[in-house]
């Protein structure tokens, strides 16, 4: 304060409040006045603005943390769903392999059954044609025998054949037991 009195004491009385030509002193005084005004008026507003900004940043961080926690929870749910889907896919694949194996076994069994029926049918067919061939051979042989017998009967029996026929009937009668 003593400085201000000295400063006022050095001023001539006649000069008053005129234009100060010392720019350096004027600028320092003006700067000090502006800084004092800014600090007194703007300081409270600036601290309020900074406090609001701090609260906004804290709220944003809390919201970001909450969203990160929600995202982590959704990620965990998605991972669980993926594991469930993988297990389900494995079960479906195993069931598919089981059913395919079962179907292959069924097809093989049906094929073997058809082959056995075909083999049985083949054997029956071969047996049928063998019997047919034997029957035809029997019919042919019997017809040939009958035709030769007819020829003999038509020609007549000579003494040797007459004796053979009589011996045949005699042997039949002796075998007969009433």
UniProtKB/Swiss-Prot annotation:
GO terms for molecular function: proton-transporting ATP synthase activity, rotational mechanism. It comes from the Eukaryota. Keywords: ATP synthesis, CF(0), Chloroplast, Hydrogen ion transport, Ion transport, Membrane, Plastid, Thylakoid, Transmembrane, Transmembrane helix, Transport. The chain crosses the membrane at residues 23-43. It holds the Pfam family ATP-synt_B. Disulfide bonds: none annotated. One of its GO terms (cellular component) is chloroplast thylakoid membrane. InterPro entries: ATP_synth_b/b'su_bac/chlpt. It is a single-pass membrane protein. It is found in: Plastid, Chloroplast thylakoid membrane. The keyword Chloroplast applies. Belongs to the ATPase B chain family. F-type ATPases have 2 components, F(1) - the catalytic core - and F(0) - the membrane proton channel. F(1) has five subunits: alpha(3), beta(3), gamma(1), delta(1), epsilon(1). F(0) has four main subunits: a(1), b(1), b'(1) and c(10-14). The alpha and beta chains form an alternating ring which encloses part of the gamma chain. F(1) is attached to F(0) by a central stalk formed by the gamma and epsilon chains, while a peripheral stalk is formed by the delta, b and b' chains. F(1)F(0) ATP synthase produces ATP from ADP in the presence of a proton or sodium gradient. F-type ATPases consist of two structural domains, F(1) containing the extramembraneous catalytic core and F(0) containing the membrane proton channel, linked together by a central stalk and a peripheral stalk. During catalysis, ATP synthesis in the catalytic domain of F(1) is coupled via a rotary mechanism of the central stalk subunits to proton translocation. Component of the F(0) channel, it forms part of the peripheral stalk, linking F(1) to F(0). In plastids the F-type ATPase is also known as CF(1)CF(0). HAMAP family: ATP_synth_b_bprime. This is ATP synthase subunit b, chloroplastic. It comes from Tetradesmus obliquus.
């Amino acid at each position: 304060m003593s400085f201000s009195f000295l400063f006022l004491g050095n001023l001539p009385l006649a000069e008053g409040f005129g234009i100060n030509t010392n720019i350096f002193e004027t600028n320092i005084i003006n700067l000090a006045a502006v800084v004092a005004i800014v600090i007194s008026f703007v300081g409270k507003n600036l601290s309020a603005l900074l406090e609001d900004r701090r609260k906004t940043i804290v709220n944003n961080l809390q919201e970001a943390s909450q969203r990160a926690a929600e995202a982590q929870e959704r990620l965990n749910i998605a991972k669980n769903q993926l594991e469930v889907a993988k297990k389900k896919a494995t079960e479906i694949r195993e069931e598919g392999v089981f059913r395919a194996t079962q179907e292959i076994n069924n097809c093989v069994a049906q094929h073997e059954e058809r082959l056995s029926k075909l083999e049985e049918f083949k054997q029956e067919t071969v047996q049928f044609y063998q019997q047919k061939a034997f029957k035809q051979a029997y019919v042919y042989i019997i017809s040939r025998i009958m035709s030769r017998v007819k020829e003999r009967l038509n020609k007549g029996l000579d003494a040797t054949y007459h004796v053979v026929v009589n011996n045949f009937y005699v042997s039949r009668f002796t075998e007969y037991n009433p």
